[in-house]
C-alpha cells in the first residue's frame, strides 16, 4: 500500500469552508468496517483493509486542507475480546502498514504519535511503532495520533497512579495538582484536545475514547460506514462543525 493518492476532486479546501474556523484537531472513531464487509458478503478483514485506505485518504485530506492534527481510534482495550483470528489479523495489519508507509509519512511531513498501553502489543509491532515515532519526530506538516490498545478509563487511572507516585515520593504537593498538571500525565500529554470528534456508522456513544480530552469537543455522528467515509463526507462534517457556536460552558 502507498500513501500516494490518485487525483482527487476535493484536493483543495472547499470554497464554502472558512479556513480560519477549521478545527485544529480532528479525532475519529472509525466504526463500521465489519458491517461494510458483511453488506458485500466479504470477510470482516476486507473491511479493515478498506478502512486503512480510508484513513490514509483522510490523513492526506487533513494535511491538504490545513488541519493540524488527526487522531484515529484504531484499537481499544475492549477489542481484545474480538475473535482471536481477527485480533491477530489487526496486529499484523498495523505492523505491515507502518512498515510500508513509513517512508511516505517521512516524505509527507507526518509526525506520528501512538497513545495507549503499548506494552501489551506484540514485540514486533512495538518495534515498528518505536521506529516510526523516531523517524517522524521532527516532521511538522501534520500530527497523526493513533490510539492503540487505548481506553479512556485506563488512561485516567494511569495518570492518577503516576501523580500518586510523585506525591508519595515527596516530589509533588497535592495542592499543586490541577487540570494542567493532570493533562501532562495523560497518554496525550503535550497534544491539543480535539475540537471535533467524528463517529461513523451512526452509533451514539463514544466507546471509552478520550473521556478527558473531548470535554468540549463538538461531536458529529454520521450513518456512513467507515470504509465509505470519503472527502465529501468529511466536507459535510466540517460544514456542520462551522455552523455551530462553541461556548465552552459560557453563554
From Swiss-Prot:
Known EC number(s)?
2.5.1.-
List GO molecular-function terms, semicolon-separated.
Answer: ditrans,polycis-polyprenyl diphosphate synthase [(2E,6E)-farnesyl diphosphate specific] activity; magnesium ion binding
- Cofactor binding mode, per the note? Binds 2 magnesium ions per subunit.
Binding residue positions for substrate: 32-36, 44, 48, 76-78, 80, 82, 199, 205-207
Q: Which UniProt keywords apply?
A: Magnesium, Metal-binding, Transferase
Superkingdom assignment: Bacteria
The active site of this protein is located at: 31, 79 (proton acceptor)
Cofactors needed by this protein, per the record, are: Mg(2+)
What function does the entry list?
Catalyzes the condensation of isopentenyl diphosphate (IPP) with allylic pyrophosphates generating different type of terpenoids.
Q: How does it assemble?
A: Homodimer.
Q: Which family does it belong to?
A: Belongs to the UPP synthase family.
- Identification of the protein by name: Isoprenyl transferase
Which organism does this record belong to? Thermosynechococcus vestitus (strain NIES-2133 / IAM M-273 / BP-1)
Amino acid at each position: 500500500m502507498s500513501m500516494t493518492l490518485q487525483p482527487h476532486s476535493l484536493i483543495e479546501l472547499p470554497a464554502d469552508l472558512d479556513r480560519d474556523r477549521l478545527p485544529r484537531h480532528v479525532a475519529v472513531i472509525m466504526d463500521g468496517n465489519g458491517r461494510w464487509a458483511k453488506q458485500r458478503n466479504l470477510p470482516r478483514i476486507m473491511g479493515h483493509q478498506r478502512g486503512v485506505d480510508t484513513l490514509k485518504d483522510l490523513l492526506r485530506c487533513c494535511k491538504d486542507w490545513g488541519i493540524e492534527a488527526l487522531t484515529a481510534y484504531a484499537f481499544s482495550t475492549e477489542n481484545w475480546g474480538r475473535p482471536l483470528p481477527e485480533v491477530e489479523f489487526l496486529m499484523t495489519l498495523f505492523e505491515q502498514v507502518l512498515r510500508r508507509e513509513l517512508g511516505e509519512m517521512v516524505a509527507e511531513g507526518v509526525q506520528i504519535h501512538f497513545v495507549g498501553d503499548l506494552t501489551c502489543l506484540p514485540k514486533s509491532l512495538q518495534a515498528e511503532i518505536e521506529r516510526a515515532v523516531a523517524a517522524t519526530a521532527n516532521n511538522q506538516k501534520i500530527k497523526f495520533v493513533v490510539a492503540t490498545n487505548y481506553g479512556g478509563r485506563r488512561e485516567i487511572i494511569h495518570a492518577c497512579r503516576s501523580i500518586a507516585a510523585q506525591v508519595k515520593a515527596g516530589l509533588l504537593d497535592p495542592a499543586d495538582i490541577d487540570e494542567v498538571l493532570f493533562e501532562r500525565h495523560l497518554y496525550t500529554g503535550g497534544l491539543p484536545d480535539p475540537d471535533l470528534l467524528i463517529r461513523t456508522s451512526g452509533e451514539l456513544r463514544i466507546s471509552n475514547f478520550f473521556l478527558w480530552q473531548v470535554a468540549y469537543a463538538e461531536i458529529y455522528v454520521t450513518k456512513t460506514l467507515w470504509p465509505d467515509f470519503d472527502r465529501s463526507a468529511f466536507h459535510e462534517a466540517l460544514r456542520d462543525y462551522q455552523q455551530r457556536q462553541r461556548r465552552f460552558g459560557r453563554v
